[in-house]
Amino acid sequence: MDFITINSSNKTEEFALKQVAKQATSSLMYRLGKTIILASVCVEREPVSEDFLPLVVQFLEKSYAAGKIPGGFVKREGRAQDFEILTSRLIDRTFRPLFPKDYRYPTQITLMVLSHDIENDLQVSALNAASVALFLAHIAPIKSVSACRIARIDDEFIINPNTSLLNQSSLDLFVSGTKESLNMIEMRSLGQKLNALEEPLMLKALELAQKSLKETCTLYEEVFTPHQNELLFKESQGIIFNERLLDLLKNQYFDEIIKGIESSALSERENVFHEIAKKISEAHSEFSLEEIEWSLEKVKKTEIRRMIIQDKIRPDKRALEEVRPILIESDLLPMAHSSILFTRGQTQSLVVGVLGTDNDAQTHESLEHKTPIKERFMFHYNFPPFCVGEASSIGAASRRELGHGNLAKRALETSIKNKEQVIRLVSEILESNGSSSMASVCAGSLALYASGVEIHDLVAGVAMGMVSEGQDYAILSDISGLEDAEGDMDFKIAGNLEGITAMQMDTKMSGIQLEILYQALLQAKEARKHILKIMHEAKEKIVINFSHLPTTEIFNVAPDKIVEIIGQGGRVIKEIVEKFEVKIDLNKPSGEVKIMGNKERVLKTKEFILNYLHSLDQELEQYTIDEVLEAQVKRIVDFGAFLSLPKGGEGLLRKQNMDRCQVVLREGDSIRCRVISFNKGKIALDLA
């Protein structure tokens, strides 16, 4: 294959254009070291009639890319893994704001990882491969985009670190954008400590990222512009509104429109605007319902922006920096290890905490790791339809739910002191009017504390928004659902009083300037201080019920005794677990026994196991080498027979000893035998 080589931002990327998958609108083979990704873009020639951007992004990992066969019973890639879904979202969120507002051609971007050497960054590589493929497709006047990752090791920022360096970093900052501005950010702190990053340092990291993106995007445009397809879709002038209808709305229905804007709940607001549209349609048949709805949307959006930018007042009458009222309740669910109900305005999150053992950890297979990894801290976010007043069934977790859960997990992960502890937090969104993921962070942090988990500090989250008109703009703290829908930016920021532990930024514009982002960071810090003050007050009222919380008892036995605790076919350990209602983890090489459950049951289980092993030792002590016994055949196995001994316990008569004497045994037979050895707590027998 012929490759085009581009050197920028500490990496050498290679692109083979239009040599594979040639029936796609555009395709390329991307190579970085030993990592190879096939990127393709396919576009349907007929636009859809619905009012949405029909863009689909699929990032797919192939097990063979790392020389592996898929684990599990079915040896074929199946349902998408979380990493694949999150990476698909990452790329989708980068490109979506760059498309023209009235682009309606079904478009699919597919990225297949064909080879991966573990050291190279799959997400940066996939986004860059997708960016060039989309640029070559030339389906719309879309700017060149690129991505970079910033790490921080020993107070020094590093652009595009490899996996080994990232594992040493206290910062994981992923940024994508054009050469002029940023349009997507994902950040989390890393390490054993909280490692919250202060706002001035965050700005410095973002400036470094912007410089990297500018360099890469400029090179992409210079190198790949000659290879672009013919432009498929030219941006139109947009919707042409009927001025008479707009005047009608402003003069006769303006008060009703304001009432709809000021309605807090999404369902209530939709009902108000539906009634307005229905009323106008009945009174003025010369206007179509679609035309009325478009015009209503325009008047609504214009008025919301005017209120915020000119009057400095928001639809719910809050000031720009004002956070909605907060109410926190704890210990609502008596059988869970913790439960926190966090209500902020009309957004309500119930976070439930449960502690577990190593067996409860989620195991993942990944191209990024040679062996399956254990996820010990899990955060699951659920967004049932009733939380926004919708009547529909609850199904499997959506991409959005996975993304919000992942964001909350990233925000809280470094606040946990003991990284070996297995913890599951579940956020049930009971009511939503914006910022539900950040409500989940606040409730989740308190739920960790209420579960008896040692944390470095409480972590709070707030969603920031922005509304702009020309050069004028306003930044909003703790945005509502309406402000999120009608605004230009959704900037979620979580952290403590010292700095930021996680953030996520999406925009509906082609990008956001750094000075606006920095202002949002500083404004978010003030909001965070306010929220943390309320959270600390709530924390003081939480009474941790240690008697109800599971406790863990760890002790060691001789490694060869572990098989005795397990028993034949797991019989003994199953009986212990069922009898005492505990969880047990056993480590054969070290002899470590870990018991988890109710404190009283755990102590009784430990006592039972030690007494059981002691009784086995006593049984062995009753016998001596060369002692002749009258034993009874208990059970026949492939390798011999287990015999019940007269003074208790059992011994093994191996098959070769039986064959040597040409003896055929049945269960229940009595036989004379001789003790020949003691091996790892077992009695070996021979025929006497």
Curated annotation (Swiss-Prot):
GO cellular component: cytosol
E.C. number(s) listed in UniProt: 2.7.7.8
Binding site for Mg(2+): 484, 490
Top EC group: transferase
Domain KH: from-to ranges: 550-609
UniProt keyword list: Cytoplasm, Magnesium, Metal-binding, Nucleotidyltransferase, RNA-binding, Transferase
Cofactor: Mg(2+)
A molecular function (GO) term: polyribonucleotide nucleotidyltransferase activity
Spans through the membrane: none
Keyword Coiled coil: no
GO biological process assignments: mRNA catabolic process; RNA processing
Highest taxon, organism lineage: Bacteria
Function: Involved in mRNA degradation. Catalyzes the phosphorolysis of single-stranded polyribonucleotides processively in the 3'- to 5'-direction.
Membership in a protein family: Belongs to the polyribonucleotide nucleotidyltransferase family.
HAMAP family reported for this sequence: PNPase (MF_01595)
Protein name: Polyribonucleotide nucleotidyltransferase
Originating gene: pnp
